[in-house]
Amino acid sequence: AEQDRPAAETRTIPLYCSPAAAGYAAPVFGEDYELLTVDGEVPVGAELAVRIQGDSMEPYIRDESVVYVNHDPLRSGDVGIFCVDGDMLCKQYYRDSLGTVYLFSLNRSRSDADQVFTAGSGRSLTCFGRVMLHNLPLPI
């Protein structure tokens, strides 16, 4: 019966107010967050939430949607939240055998927003976490 089922466990995680851009860059997020109460609908390992701005990750991640992020190491094909030269981006990660890092837009009509980092490029790249999605095909 309905009353025999345990209540869904609720918890709070930070929802960052500064969006991660899926397309054009957004400013880096810091202390500007609100606590979001989540339940069993949210993946268990989610450590934070980020609102997405832009269309470069559609149709998998829509403009203005909220994604859930953990701190698991990224593997090629994973989607992550990145700080690139001081701006926040949501992109699909790929690293080749030479150490070149590619950040892809899943919406290939927005390939203009792809980023490439070669060794010695002098560009700053930090990963803030892995977006919790099912495996997606690389857009190559």
What does each model-found stretch correspond to?
Residues 96-140:
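Glycine- and charge-enriched low-complexity intrinsically disordered segments
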Residues 79-80, 90-95:
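Short beta-strand-centered aromatic/proline hotspots
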